Design a protein with these regions (language model features):
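FAD-site-proximal beta/loop scaffold in flavoenzymes
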Residues: 3-82
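Mid-to-C-terminal Rossmann-like scaffold of FAD/NAD(P)H-dependent oxidoreductases
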Residues: 55-126
Length: 126
């Protein structure tokens, strides 16, 4: 659109490639990019088997309109924290499930590079 945005540093980050195909568990369902598919409780298609981080795919979730998976370390950390909460909720065995955390409502990535604060906020084009 011709708009110029001044900045001190530009970092191009595209995430990582999942390698779920290295995990040799019979009947474990992988996505087309070799990520382990998980439900909204981070559980795979195998009962009591969970996956989180870059190897997990949430492609079958009903996403909030401003969130998508980009496989950056901040999302991996959020997945890990949320997966631990889901495992604990399942361990309680009270019939409840864990509600999706707010971090799955809006995709943002905040970090520091070379002493600069970096905020990445992306809108995906479908």
């Amino acid at each position: 659109n011709g708009k110029v945005i001044k900045c001190d540093l530009v970092v191009s980050a595209t995430g990582v490639i999942p390698n779920g195909d290295t995990i040799k568990i019979d009947d474990l369902i992988l996505d087309s990019d070799n990520a382990i598919t998980v439900n909204d409780q981070m559980e795979t298609n195998l009962k009591h088997v969970y996956a989180a981080g870059d190897v997990a795919s949430c492609s079958r979730w009903k996403h909030a309109p401003l969130w998508f998976q980009m496989r950056l370390w901040t999302q991996a950390r959020q997945f890990g924290s949320y997966a631990a909460q889901c495992v604990h909720t399942a361990w309680l065995d009270n019939g409840n499930s864990k509600d999706l955390d707010f971090c799955f409502e809006l995709f943002t990535h905040a970090t520091k590079f070379f002493g600069f604060k970096v905020i990445l906020q992306v809108r995906r084009k479908d």
